[in-house]
Amino acid sequence: VRLLLLFALGAFVALILQIILPRLLPSGILAPDLVLILAVDLGMRHPGALTAVLAFGMGYAVDTFSGVELGLNALLLTLVFLFAYWLSRVLMSTSTAMGVIIVFTGVIFTDVANYLICSRFAAAERLHMIMPAILIQAAFTALLTPSVFRITAWGSRIVGLRQYNRNR
C-alpha cells in the first residue's frame, strides 16, 4: 500500500510537471517524460503484479491528460515497465546507469510508437523529420533519470519500503 501511495503521488506530481513544463520551456521537446522514469524505476526496483498495474494506471493517467488514442500510453508505459523488469532480471542489475539507458530507449520507443499509431502508419516515411526532436527529448529525460531515482529512493526510505541493491 505504501508503494502504491508513493508512486501515485509521484505520478501525480510528474503529470502536473509534464503539463506545465512545455509552456514554461522555450521548446516543448525539452519537457522530460517523468512518468516514464517512474515506470522504469518500478520495473527495475519494485517487481510485482501490483507495480505492473500501477504502471498501467500511470499510463492511463497520461492518456486522460494528453493522449490522442485512449489506452495507448497505458499500453506503451506497461511495455516499458515490462522491458525494464525483464532487463534488470536478465542482467541482474538495478544500477542507475542501466536505468538511464532503459529510459533513453523507452522514450524513443514510446514517442515513435505514439507517432506511428496516431498517424495510422500513414506518415512513416516522415519519421526521419521528427527523430531529432525525439532524440533530444530522450536525452533530456535520460539526464534527469538519476535525480528522479534519488527522489524515489528517498521517498521509499521515508515510507519504510524495502530497498533493493542498486548494483546487484
Regions found by a protein language model. Give the residues of each.
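Terminal, non-globular segments
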Residues: 1-168
